A protein has these predicted regions:
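Residues forming the flavin
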Residues: 1-274
């Protein structure tokens, strides 16, 4: 209760003193001096440009999240014959959704020798609908003038280089990209928040506080989560810690820091410090 919610508002800058600069159509340019800040900007999808797929630049190449919005919110189909590059959960879910809506999903193609999605989504979204999953494969060419007409898929070797002679040509009108998510941390970087090079998100303490005192982070801005349940738990922890900070219950200084080191077989840890 009593919380001001500013929609259609873009934050332009956050200073290390927690001064927020923002703009919206109603207030114009505004400054907000915050006592505590919770960063919850989420993440964005990798695009074709980020992964450098060769070929022409026709219509019909979408990120999986964009296609999801087309179907679920706009009520229109992105295409009828679809190839999906990447086996992230959004891509797997869209393979099923597009099939249910009448499209033909020809293949799901994954660069790695394993899928990037949950096993339950592989079973329920691909196997149950007879959609083939090509592991250790990638898209090596996109063909078409005004619209995608063909996609060339090739096997890759252990160095992820295309294997000559392994090409498969799919006649399709749509290519969906489900090739990973990137935590949205431009504002964090501007504010001087220390980022973890492995997660591309803020380095956080066990209470989700970042390297800047009074600035907390949670959800996919910290690292990409598989399940929204984990985001909810993390957000609750960050909110409670921000409230405690405003009441004077701040964490100790650097002398109390205990860094966590990822051991053998562990890629990274969150939090990074306790």
């Amino acid at each position: 209760q009593g919380i001001d919610i500013k929609t259609d508002t873009m934050v332009l800058d956050i200073s290390d003193s927690r001064l927020i600069q923002a703009v919206n159509p109603t207030d114009g340019y505004l400054s907000i001096q915050a006592g505590a800040i919770v960063l919850a900007m989420g993440c964005r999808e990798r695009t074709r440009g980020a992964i450098g797929i060769p070929g022409t630049r026709p219509a019909g190449v979408y990120t999986a999240g964009c296609a999801q919005r087309f179907v679920n919110i706009e009520g229109c189909m992105p295409g009828r014959r679809v190839v999906i590059l990447g086996s992230g959960d959004i891509g797997l879910i869209m393979a099923r959704r597009l099939t249910l809506e009448g499209a033909k999903v020809l293949a799901c193609v994954e660069l790695q020798p394993y899928s990037g999605g949950l096993q339950r989504n592989i079973t329920q979204c691909l196997e149950d609908f007879g959609i083939p999953l090509y592991l250790s494969h990638t898209v090596t060419d996109i063909r078409g003038d005004k619209r995608v007409e063909q996609v060339v898929v090739s096997a890759v070797d252990d160095s992820r280089r295309p294997v000559p002679g392994s090409e498969m040509v799919f006649d399709c009108d749509t290519l969906l990209l489900s090739v990973g998510l990137i935590p949205e941390n431009e504002l964090s970087r501007q504010a001087g928040v220390e980022l973890d090079p492995r997660t591309n998100g803020p380095r956080v303490y066990e209470n989700m506080e970042t390297s800047l005192s009074g600035v907390f982070a949670c959800g996919n801005v910290v690292h990409v989560h598989d399940l929204v349940d984990f985001v909810t738990m993390e957000s609750t922890r960050a909110g409670e810690a921000a409230a405690a900070y405003l009441q004077g219950d701040a964490r100790g200084g650097p002398a109390l820091e205990v860094p966590i080191r990822a051991g053998e077989g562990v890629t990274y840890t969150v939090p990074q410090v306790i």
